[in-house]
Design a protein with these regions (language model features):
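A domain-level signal for the structural core that forms small-molecule/cofactor-binding pockets
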Residues: 1-108
Length: 108
């Protein structure tokens, strides 16, 4: 963790180059702002059949840490929001979900 998953309207999916740039932005934000180890960062892009709402939904799952205060998470979300607009031209709904170690069961 963190895992950053983007569900993007299939009809408005950005070009591969734009997604690669956004992926690099996400890795940078996760390692610098959230202080995650590079090996623990995952970024995934999913094509979605859009129903209603923003054309992008960003779902961030992360491990709760004392360094990830509300102010840090707000800074992360603001920077992520700007990166999404800069790389895709689309508006995103961003949601972050923190998990404590006792509530997280994982492999690999």
């Amino acid at each position: 963790m963190p895992n950053v998953t983007f569900s993007i309207d299939a009809n408005r999916m950005p070009a591969d180059d734009s997604l690669a740039e956004l992926s690099r932005d996400c890795v940078e934000l996760c390692t610098q702002v959230l202080e995650a180890a590079l090996k623990n960062v995952h970024v995934i892009f999913l094509e979605a059949r859009h129903g209603h709402g923003h054309p992008v939904f960003a779902d961030i799952r992360y491990r709760v840490a004392t360094s990830r205060t509300p102010a840090v998470m707000n800074r992360f979300m603001e920077a992520l929001d700007h990166a999404i607009v800069r790389r895709t031209g689309l508006t995103a709904r961003i949601r972050c979900f923190g998990y404590t170690t006792s509530n997280l069961h994982a492999r690999n």
